[in-house]
A protein has these predicted regions:
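Conserved catalytic-core segments of large NTP-driven translation/proteostasis enzymes
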Residues: 11-160, 197
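C-terminal effector modules of nucleic-acid-centric enzymes and ribosome-associated factors
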Residues: 1, 11, 127-237
Length: 237
């Protein structure tokens, strides 16, 4: 039975970047194989871990927001760059509202500051829970742009079974945000599997991004991943 499952997984991953990835058999019921899984993860990541960028502007894509009695608004997320310090004044994008850092927790421990790569919970003042949602970004004032237009370089997966054509409706993912958009092809009539092209994405609501941000796109329906790319110009003129 395990051999059949392994064959099914290999078949599903065929043609993707995980095609030749190692498979580790683990039992969720007994825990058998967990040690092997940990060793394999350590082996795979040993040469992949890079120094996180703590010297650029702080950016925290928000994945959860809630209120706590006696504290107020709490946000959580993974800091993707820079450093956030208690008492900092930052801005919530695309809301546009400035807020102050009241307290910081990293893995349940109170900290005076947090660094890129850390999973954090931050207590904010001057902003309400209803003003924030998953996909918002906490960053310094005037450091990001809210936009509904993006010029991007888009790469279609080799394994894609569909072709990207002009004005295709897509799901756009970056950070923790998901927004619907239309793809306007700029340099060709269509982009097929394994091909790249320059595309303008016309968003159905504003997003907050910076030049160089990575993204993933999926077809609107059926919701299949088509590829991804990099933002070349937010808010192009």
């Amino acid at each position: 039975w395990l051999e059949m499952m392994e064959e099914d997984v290999r078949e599903e991953l065929s043609g993707t970047f995980l095609e030749h990835a190692p498979l580790v058999k683990v039992s969720a019921a007994t825990g058998a194989g967990l040690d092997d899984l940990v060793k394999e993860i350590e082996h795979q990541t040993r040469d992949e871990v890079v120094q996180k960028d703590i010297h650029t502007i702080p950016r925290l894509p928000i994945d959860r927001v809630f209120t706590l009695s006696g504290f107020g608004t709490i946000i959580t997320g993974t800091l993707v760059s820079g450093t956030i310090t208690k008492e900092d004044t930052l801005q919530m994008y695309p809301v546009g509202k400035e807020c102050k850092i009241r307290s910081i927790q990293v893995h349940g421990e109170d900290k005076k500051e947090c660094y890129a790569g850390q999973r954090v919970a931050i207590n904010l003042s001057n902003v309400k829970k209803k003003e924030i949602k998953r996909g918002c970004v906490l960053a310094p004032p005037n450091s990001m742009k809210n936009t509904d237009l993006l010029d991007v370089k888009l790469n279609v997966l080799d394994s894609s079974v569909r072709i990207l054509t002009n004005h295709t409706r897509l799901h756009f993912f970056t950070g923790t945000s998901e927004v619907l958009c239309r793809a306007v092809l700029l340099d060709k009539e269509e982009i097929g599997p394994g091909e790249s092209g320059y595309v303008q994405l016309r968003m159905e609501e504003e997003v907050a991004v910076r030049r160089g941000d990575k993204f993933v796109v999926r077809f609107y329906s059926p919701m299949e991943t088509i590829g991804g790319g990099v933002v070349l110009e937010p808010n192009p003129k």
